[in-house]
Amino acid sequence: MKILDCTLRDGGFVNDFDWDLRFAKRYLEFMSRIKVPIVELGYWKQNSKSKNRFYNFNEDTLDQIYNGVSTPLDMSIMIDYHYCSKKISDYPKNGTTPINLVRITSRKEDLPKALKFAETLKNKTNLDMAFQIINSTNYTRKELLKTTEIIAKHDFLYVYFADSHGNLNLNENYDNYRDSVEALRFNGKKVGFHLHNHTGRALMNYYFCKNNNI
């Protein structure tokens, strides 16, 4: 199992993405010391929902937070296709920053365009790409499999199922995901779950993933 911590990025919804830079720097240092493999700090250069720096995250903010970290670690950014910049030049190229992973998500109706954009972004930046299926508990088993079979044809290192509403119970509902997980793995994708704790199930679901090698 490989942990990606996105507390500052996803937690930004509770404070309008306005983390104090000193706090963010201390947080990143702590993640470094406990050897979290990947840390995601914000949405990259988006401004439709907030003008604050962890929604409109950029190179300058990254430098302020990352410089001085005692142990280098891999960095990830998130983009929502519906809101993100479509200018490829707005994104860093591999090796120019600590960022080496872009995670993209999209609405159902935007999926074909999002996949095409992710493919272009991968080719132009040489960054690893990941796709996150949001609201995954809203899908039927067949809908989820159909979606993942489409995603599996593209060059994503990781594919995540997001428990956007925190109502996922993998002990009871994993059968809804089983075929999709197998299809992704068959196509060489690494599979993950993005867990939320709205209903107090995140730890339970974490142990399910850990015990089932997800």
Language model segments and positions:
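Active-site beta->alpha loop and helix N-cap motifs at the rims of alpha/beta catalytic domains
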Residues: 32, 38, 43-150
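Alpha-helical structural signal in soluble globular domains
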Residues: 64, 68, 120-124, 150-154, ...
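Charged helix-capping and loop-helix junction motifs
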Residues: 20-21, 55-60, 143-149, 173-179, ...
